[in-house]
Regions:
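Short, surface-exposed acidic
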Residues: 200-211, 255-265, 301-307
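Small-residue-centered hinge/linker elements
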Residues: 1-140, 157-158, 163-248, 308-363
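Amphipathic alpha-helical segments at domain termini/boundaries
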Residues: 211-238, 242-247, 252-294
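Glycine-rich beta-to-alpha transition loops that act as phosphate-gripper elements at the mouths
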Residues: 145-153, 265-268
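Structural detector of well-ordered beta-strand residues that form the stable sheet scaffold
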Residues: 145, 167-168, 282
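Short beta-strand/loop segments at the ligand-binding rim of alpha/beta enzyme cores
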Residues: 135-146, 253-260
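Extended hydrophobic/aromatic segments used for targeting, binding, or gating
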Residues: 286-323
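Glycine-/small-residue-rich active-site loops that bind phosphorylated ligands and cofactors
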Residues: 120-121, 152, 283
Length: 363
């Protein structure tokens, strides 16, 4: 019986060693291919290009880089996040900026097409995109064109006004130059939370009390069991007013608009294409293909001698590639995770967002 057990153990170890050796051999082979060994084998699928082809003349050396700004704009992904962009409604401004910085080093990129589909988001995330656009233009002298497909509101406007020109597709909405500050809740004489007996909440005869221990004047601002003071509300309003002043100045300077018109006539409304053009928010109405053609014209590229490309999927390393077949693919963040991440930003941050952000956090 002992001999049988030892024989089985030996066979198991032999299989494990064979598997490890196979991984090592595959790793050496992949490394060799990448450095020229085994050059007769195509490396196309083993070394993904920096960009992937979208449309145009695939043989052209003139790249027009398409960058998607789709969803709520945040700053940077959480630590350990393997995704450049969430597939379910978030975009990270500093990731967009990084792409623009790298594009500025690539002489094959002759221009940038920003594909805008966003209600806005955080100020710093939106500003990161704007700063990336300005850096790219200053470093290269190449054009950047923003293309609005449906909506670019609030933080989207803050970001895209750095482009040379802005075009919106038919039926789009552009605008919402405004800032949303703190949203404070106050429970006035509460006797239940979360719907009471019908909603599975808590009901008491004497109401619900909550005590927050804090130090520093106004540190417990946001406690729903006390009203904010007039002084606290004024401070919050002053902060929002300051950010709004900066926003108006930013748009006015970069789009050559009158700040008085923005404040008194436009407000924080969104506009159809005709009105947006009249105010100077966009240069006109163009569809996707015609916007690309306009970008090629600004880049002084001969007719049709270009290809539209976008950034390739991020490579997570050789070991991941080798073991990927044995591992389940990482699922994209769940909607609940996305909502939680965004809702955490709402506590004290001023937002450049179109609509009521609390609706994203209401379920």
């Amino acid at each position: 019986m002992l001999k049988g057990f030892l024989r089985l153990l030996g066979q198991t170890l032999s299989i494990l060693m064979s598997f490890v050796l196979l991984i090592i051999v595959l790793g050496i082979l992949a490394f060799g291919i990448g450095t020229g060994i085994g050059s007769s084998i195509s490396t196309e699928t083993l070394e993904p290009d920096l960009y992937t082809f979208v449309f145009g003349d695939e043989s052209s050396s003139n790249n027009l880089l398409k960058i998607n700004v789709e969803g709520v704009i945040l700053g940077s992904p959480p630590q350990g996040d393997l995704y450049w962009f969430s597939e379910e409604g978030l975009v990270y401004g500093y990731d967009i900026q990084d792409i623009l910085i790298e594009a500025a080093k690539d002489s094959s990129v002759k221009g940038i097409l920003l594909n805008m589909q966003t209600p806005g988001g955080t100020i710093f995330g939106s500003r990161a995109i704007f700063d990336g656009i300005k850096l790219y233009r200053e470093k290269t002298g190449n054009p950047v064109v923003a293309y609005v497909q449906g909506m670019s509101a609030s933080g989207g406007v803050l970001a895209m006004v750095g482009a040379n020109e802005i075009y919106a597709d038919h039926g789009s909405l552009v605008g919402s130059i405004g800032v949303i500050g703190d949203t404070l809740t106050y429970f006035n004489k509460p006797t239940a939370i979360d719907g009471g007996i019908l909603g599975g909440g808590i009901v008491t005869k004497e109401g619900i009390e909550q005590t927050i221990v804090s130090a520093g004047k106004g540190k417990d601002l946001g406690n729903p069991f006390r009203r904010p003071t007039k002084e606290e509300l004024k401070l919050l309003q002053d902060d929002v007013n300051h950010e709004y002043d900066l926003f108006v100045k930013h748009v006015a300077e970069n789009r050559n608009m009158d700040s008085k018109v923005i404040r008194e006539q436009m407000g924080a409304h969104v506009f159809d294409n005709e009105s947006a053009k009249k105010f100077g928010l966009i240069n006109g109405t163009l569809n996707y293909r015609d916007t690309v053609k306009r970008l090629a014209e600004l880049a002084q590229i001969e007719t049709d001698d270009y290809q539209v490309v976008q950034t390739a999927t991020k490579n997570h390393g050789l070991l991941s590639a080798l073991l990927g077949v044995f591992q389940p693919k990482s699922a994209p963040p769940k909607v609940s995770q996305i909502k939680s991440q965004f809702c955490n930003k709402l506590s004290r941050l001023p937002l450049v967002y179109y609509g009521n952000p609390l609706r994203l956090c209401s379920h």
